[in-house]
Amino acid sequence: MAQLTKNFGKIVKTLTIPHLLNLQIDSYELFLQKDIPPTSREDAGLEGVFRSVFPIEDFNRTASLEYVSYEIGEPKYDVPECIAKGLTFEAPLRIKVRLVVYDVDEETENRTIRDIKEQIIYFGTVPLMTEKGTFIINGTERVIVNQLQRSPGIIFEHDSGKSHTSRKVLYSCRIIPMRGSWLDFDYDHKDILYVRIDRRRKMPATILFKAMGMSRADILRYFYEVEHFTFEPHHVFRQVLPDFYRKEKAYSEIRDSEGKVIVAVDKPITKRAWRLMLEAGIEKVEVDPATLLGLFLAEDLADPATGEVMAEAGDELNADLIEKLKDAGIVELSLLHTRGVDTSSSIRDTLALDKTIDTITAQVEIYRRLRPSSPPTPEIAANFFENLFRNPDYYDLSPVGRYKINARLKVDQPLDFRTLANDDILKAVKHLTFLKDSHGPADDIDHLGNRRVRPVGELVENQYRIGLVRMERAIKERMSLQEVATLMPHDLINPKPVAAVLKEFFGTSQLSQFMDQTNPLSEVTHKRRLSALGPGGLTRERAGFEVRDVHTSHYGRICPIETPEGPNIGLIVSLTTHSKVNDFGFIETPYKVVKDGQLTGETIYLDATREIDEVIAGANAPLDENKAFINSMVGARIRGDQVVIPREQVTLMDISPSQIVSVSAALIPFLEHDDANRALMGSNMQRQAVPLLRCEQPLVGTGMEGAVAKDSGSCILAEGEGFVHYADAERIIVCYDDPAVGTDTGSAKTYELLKHHKSNQNTCFGQVPRVLVGQRVVKGDVLADGPGIRDGELALGKNLLVAFMPWCGYNYEDSILISENAVKDDTFTSVHIEEFEVVARDTKLGPEEITRDIPNVGEEMLKDLDDCGIIRIGARVAPDDILVGKITPKGETQLTPEEKLLRAIFGDKARDVKNTSLKVPPGIEGTVIDVRVFNRRSGEKDDRTRQIEDFELARLDTKEGQHAAAIAANVRRRLWPVVSGKTVFQTIKGVKKGEVLLEANHPMTQEVLEALPVKKLSGLFTSKETNEAVAEVLDEYDRHIQFIKGLYDQKREKTTEGDDLPPGVIKMVKVYVAVKRKLNVGDKMAGRHGNKGVVSCILPIEDMPFFSHGRPVDIVLNPLGVPSRMNIGQILETHLGWAGMELGRQLAEMVDSGKAMEGVRDRAKAVFDTEETTALIDGMSDDDLRDALRALKNGIVAKTPVFDGATEDELWSWLKLAGLPEDGKVTLYDGRTGEAFHRPVTVGCMYILKLHHLVDEKIHARSTGPYSLVTQQPLGGKAQFGGQRLGEMEVWALEAYGASYLLQEFLTVKSDDVGGRVKMYEKIVKGDNFLEAGLPESFNVLVKELMSLGLDVDLIQDEKKIAKAPPRR
């Protein structure tokens, strides 16, 4: 039955939210390509790494180890087994390699194949991802966080005038590869261009150009326009070039062929005049000879007679040189154009600094700069330079880098060309000089077009590459040390370096994190998180404000709200609801395409770069029925700026208003009315909400709750159409119609439900079935709710009746006053599971033993332990109770003669062991819910282990029987159309004696088919075709039964076999204790708007403020917490929740009071008032409508999507409809006196969460406990069972009060006076409470410290021994 909800959203959804875990799951699937045949795999992920590292050749090129393919096996243990046993969820990886041995001809160096050996080699294990997008590493669930990193490619920057005292803006360019040397071009304040390779010493950039094979003239001609001048006696002419216009004054009259003056003397040559000159065929114009001075030669000039070089390209022209050239008879000059507004002589000036003369010297110079230690030969230098940027083994731009360079420099190289071409470098420098000369804008490094996401698949791929490169070195060494012809591939390959790198990455990397598993929302947001930290990223100390700030390109891609509050603010962010990551790693967001002011119905995903030139309208721009803009002027965004423009210019439109925020922020109703800081706190605190004993979905939601619940993986969803064959609290079995679902298991799938599962944060995760036996389900239906989920929707807190008013100071400073009902009814009770582990080891003195026979322990302490010394399930335990009894052998101590005698007479060895039992730590009180015992494979099993095994085997038998019955039910369903009405040729007898189910020659009925065992249907019918059809189905049935039998046999085998325990461990026991945490004073609570507080008082229900009709409120909040925090969303939620609560109650009452259904139906339509819900109500029968309205007795669920929610008018109209005051205020009465409060109070319904900051886990009390070894002072902190620190400020306070005896007690016997502590204990025992303080241990520490500095300090007890100082003279 559909739940009736009121949706206040106006914008029609045209695109469903992509699966929230797609990024993690798809990325790792692409990395593994597990189910793709080896021949069809893409050159990416694991396949790409193997292809890039192999083939591996030896140094003499006599052998080559080639990669063929890989295969990934099935994991040995499933996910629950890995978590229980503390193992890694992984699968074996095997690679097929080929060792080719060659014969090399010494003269020609040609190779011929001598031998080929192919082999499949075990290559370690590879961690697998669970269906929820997590990894199980050593039994703990971890998440690999996606990294947000600077994209490979090219970037142009400037320093904004901050680098040099002259405040001159210095431009730079950087080419960043995925792997290889960085290339930086930087201008200095003198306009000299330098290059740095790998951020080493800088050198003139022209050295790099020369190393690339360019001459001085080539360099100058590439970067400058060339002008041609001609000397004639007493005149200098410049050639007129069609595509080279210069604005200057005419030196002499310019006439056309007819003598008509085009430009007069000293008049400027305009563009029109230039065009007339070209039309008139004028090829040269006279210029002032003085203009040549200071220009630079474009090429070398040689004496025509002798061939001697008179001037080199780049030399400056002066009067002497001009005369020299004229004397030599040179009449034509090619000069560089360096005097334009946007041209400068920077490249020529750099060339003048460059002392290298040709390619070889340039390459040698680069080698020297990068490898200063060894002098190179030209061949080594040339090879080194070639490897820098042109060898794919050493330099890899990656497809992303090539794509970015192609787009920025407008070059057209294929994406698989992943090294640097000369053209790339030259165009980059040319663009850099253009930016410098024209003072153009630099690239924005914080723009999302210049930052990309490295998802989990790519991060693991990089680790594999590191490991394989290490392995490659070892293989090459082995090939050179041994005779390759006698070796097999497995002799060369050792996968340990790869395994070590992977283990380090998954276990200790900054990006491999312990999953935040407080509730399903915290899981989802952790998997959708992007981190700028980690290897190859930023560090929080060095990250500036700009990189942390919200950027216009984040719109629709990265949430501007959700980020941590501490030092990581802005460095750790979240993906928005609709965003995707494309193949290049850039974040994309969806838009609707607009043409001529009308939507085309097409949806496209764009990254931040491709969006730059688009004009994008907001999602809430009003449209008519033809999906055209109603208003002629529309609000839109261009390059991040808000503008109002004609509708015809709009090219795109937002998909949804919620596309700009993340999942957590999209769960906050009326987010648009909250201050950004409080919204940030609200989205962060929802992740800390503890799943409660009884969940309740919010009365005021946003519509995102269902998507989060279903995509989190905490719910169990139906995989297709079918019916529920079996359902209980442990498992659900669904029989599917589609044979493709559960192919091996006869289209019947068993779903095991989680029960009392301990999460990473110790919260209790359990699943509750939501379907009944026989119920039809379709794909995506919720079969079972997870923790913090109700009816397939996220439900983290409770709907409470709230009043905003002060109450005797108990809600001062955000404190919360709450009704005793919340504790009595277990409203905010949550269950937390603590895991305790004890290990029995083999020690040098003998083995430890887990036993009930513990020395010096009374029977009372052992009452809940079984014969093996392990606590029984269901036992209530308190601090210091024994969970598992364990004794450890003691070292031999010196015995007195009397003890030796007794030992010899009675043979008493019992005192040789000490009690090392596992006890309940302080602050934990609960019930034992599970015990797991792990034994060595070869070890003997105790009674408890056998008992657990027997119970598990019985469960497996039951499960197998239920699964087989489900397969049989599916078979009967498939057979019924085949056998319906078909006659049987023999009488069918029942189980009971003499019972006949069906006489011979009678048609088959449904009842008989259900009563008959499936196997007995074989050959039962008179029709041959029917028997054949039945036999075909039964063959399939046999195959499925055999498959599940094999499956359960494997599970039985695993249950009875021992465990792989670490070396030296005999037995391990894990005990799980469920702790019930009721709401307590000091617990932290919060709403969804950043309105957090601590419970200050739990008030008896009779003292709570109450309404005129007698109902008390549940919670009282401080009204002063709203105005200054500016989170008005909580007030709007309160009003809307109150209206929904009241309207739901009224509709349920109308049904229960027996009112005419016609009136009830009309009232329901008036309340819900949307086309969709009205149609749903009209389509319901009276009985269905009654049931649906009765379900609303606690309130109507209202959905108010972010930025598209309920307006004030709608809110007021709902309050009016419910018969409530429109201002949301009523008069309340004091529960203690019964008198009305002086002013009306804002009341309503608010969704309140209990956060994972529980007072029971924070506060503890110490009388005596552990002391520090050095200072002998009590330790600090709850974990060490430490004491409260008494610092110097507290000492000053006690001094101020003159409490000298108290102070002496604090500083001596209560702290570090060891002797005094013992004496104090004796005095208390005797009843003599007299303080006798000694010397604090810290004083002795001070004395020893002074001694270590060479100062001998003696403590003199007797005054007479004090030496008197001699009198001063």
From Swiss-Prot:
GO BP field: DNA-templated transcription
SUPFAM superfamilies tied to this protein: beta and beta-prime subunits of DNA dependent RNA-polymerase
Family: Belongs to the RNA polymerase beta chain family.
Domain of life: Bacteria
MF annotations from Gene Ontology: DNA binding; DNA-directed RNA polymerase activity; ribonucleoside binding
Role summary: DNA-dependent RNA polymerase catalyzes the transcription of DNA into RNA using the four ribonucleoside triphosphates as substrates.
EC number of the protein: 2.7.7.6
Catalytic activity: RNA(n) + a ribonucleoside 5'-triphosphate = RNA(n+1) + diphosphate
GO cellular component: DNA-directed RNA polymerase complex
Record note on quaternary structure: The RNAP catalytic core consists of 2 alpha, 1 beta, 1 beta' and 1 omega subunit. When a sigma factor is associated with the core the holoenzyme is formed, which can initiate transcription.
UniProt KW keywords: DNA-directed RNA polymerase, Nucleotidyltransferase, Transcription, Transferase
Protein name: DNA-directed RNA polymerase subunit beta
Native organism: Solidesulfovibrio magneticus (strain ATCC 700980 / DSM 13731 / RS-1)
Membrane-crossing segments per the record: none
